[in-house]
Amino acid sequence: MQLENIEILENHSLAPYAYTQAGGLVDYLAIPKSIHELKVLVNWAKELGMPVQVFGRLSNLIVRNGGLRGLSILLHDLRDVVVDQNKIVASAGADLIWVTEQAFEHGLSGLEWGAGIPGSVGGAVFMNAGAYGGQVDMVVSSVTALMPDGTLQNFEKKALEFGYRKSVFQSNGGIIISATFELQPDSCTAIRTRMDENNFKRANKQPLNYPSNGSVFKRPEGYFAGKLIMDSKLQGVRRGGVEVSKKHAGFMVNIAHGTGNDYEDLIHYVQKTVYEKFGVHLETEVRIMGER
């Protein structure tokens, strides 16, 4: 169906768009090409009383087999990136890896930790993503969001309420539109060296040859999730087509047409086993949504 020349897909699978290559059907799916189109879609759903879910590149999401009700919006066509002196303004759907490369090309340091991290700028801000000693809250100075009342609001750093894998957008209903990164000048050679070092670590430690969400669990205080899982002898354990990676225990990989339910079942089994063995509850870093 069409809404002001915006294509809306009905009963459409999210699996082809997801990094896990798993996920159920959504009632309606749309991919806006502008903020105006995003507003039109949100208003349409609101008028019909439909729930709205907004996603970036589905790198940190598990959708159960029963799928999602209402309207699901993917922002990956909102991907403008503008470099202005030591600042980069990136749209929510921009690939974080691409933004990291733009920083390198302009001799701007601070995003090297993002080299090789899949996902969108919006998703990275939403989760306060980070790796190898770097994190979104160390480099983002402001964020623009579309609020539930239909207005665009600018959030300065303090108002973003960043925490470990947390931001204000997990509770205020705002849809992230763009983020401003404030970086530091450095030589391109030094920046590339740090990026290459991080990519080398990833290639050696992570199962990059299979679909996955990356790190499944948050780091529990005083522990490392991957080591707890490894010490629980859970590597190689499967539920359906999803397996605890033999290469990195903190990852779950889709090795044989796994489903969203397979991921969730394996997550619950790992949580239960680790808690019984060590008394530590593993909290998921990935988001699990939808109906069983």
From Swiss-Prot:
Residue intervals of the FAD-binding PCMH-type domain: 21-186
Annotated family: Belongs to the MurB family.
Active site, UniProt feature: 165, 215 (proton donor), 285
Gene Ontology MF terms: FAD binding; UDP-N-acetylmuramate dehydrogenase activity
GO biological process: cell division; cell wall organization; peptidoglycan biosynthetic process; regulation of cell shape
InterPro entries the record matches: FAD-bd_PCMH, FAD-bd_PCMH-like_sf, FAD-bd_PCMH_sub1, FAD-bd_PCMH_sub2, MurB, MurB_C, MurB_C_sf, Oxid_FAD_bind_N
Pathway field: Cell wall biogenesis; peptidoglycan biosynthesis
Catalytic activity: UDP-N-acetyl-alpha-D-muramate + NADP(+) = UDP-N-acetyl-3-O-(1-carboxyvinyl)-alpha-D-glucosamine + NADPH + H(+)
Subcellular location: Cytoplasm
EC number: 1.3.1.98
Gene3D superfamilies with a match to the protein in the record: 3.30.465.10, UDP-N-acetylenolpyruvoylglucosamine reductase, C-terminal domain, Uridine Diphospho-n-acetylenolpyruvylglucosamine Reductase, domain 2
Predominant subcellular localization, coarse grouping: cytoplasm
Keywords of the record: Cell cycle, Cell division, Cell shape, Cell wall biogenesis/degradation, Cytoplasm, FAD, Flavoprotein, NADP, Oxidoreductase, Peptidoglycan synthesis
Organism whose genome encodes this protein: Leuconostoc mesenteroides subsp. mesenteroides (strain ATCC 8293 / DSM 20343 / BCRC 11652 / CCM 1803 / JCM 6124 / NCDO 523 / NBRC 100496 / NCIMB 8023 / NCTC 12954 / NRRL B-1118 / 37Y)
Protein function: Cell wall formation.
GO CC annotations, alphabetized: cytosol
Protein name in UniProt: UDP-N-acetylenolpyruvoylglucosamine reductase
Cofactor requirement: FAD
Matches recorded under Pfam families: FAD_binding_4 (PF01565), MurB_C (PF02873)
Name of the encoding gene: murB
